[in-house]
Swiss-Prot record:
Location within or outside the cell: Secreted
Record keyword Secreted present: yes
Main location: secreted
Protein name: Extended FMRFamide-3
GO biological process, one term: neuropeptide signaling pathway
Organism lineage string: Eukaryota, Metazoa, Ecdysozoa, Arthropoda, Hexapoda
Cellular component aspect of the GO annotation: extracellular region
Modification sites for Leucine amide: 9
Protein family according to the UniProt entry: Belongs to the FARP (FMRF amide related peptide) family.
Keywords: Amidation, Neuropeptide, Secreted
Biological role: FMRFamides and FMRFamide-like peptides are neuropeptides.
Amino acid sequence: LPDSSFLRL
């Protein structure tokens, strides 16, 4: 999911 991308911060 693209939303999970913010968790990479």
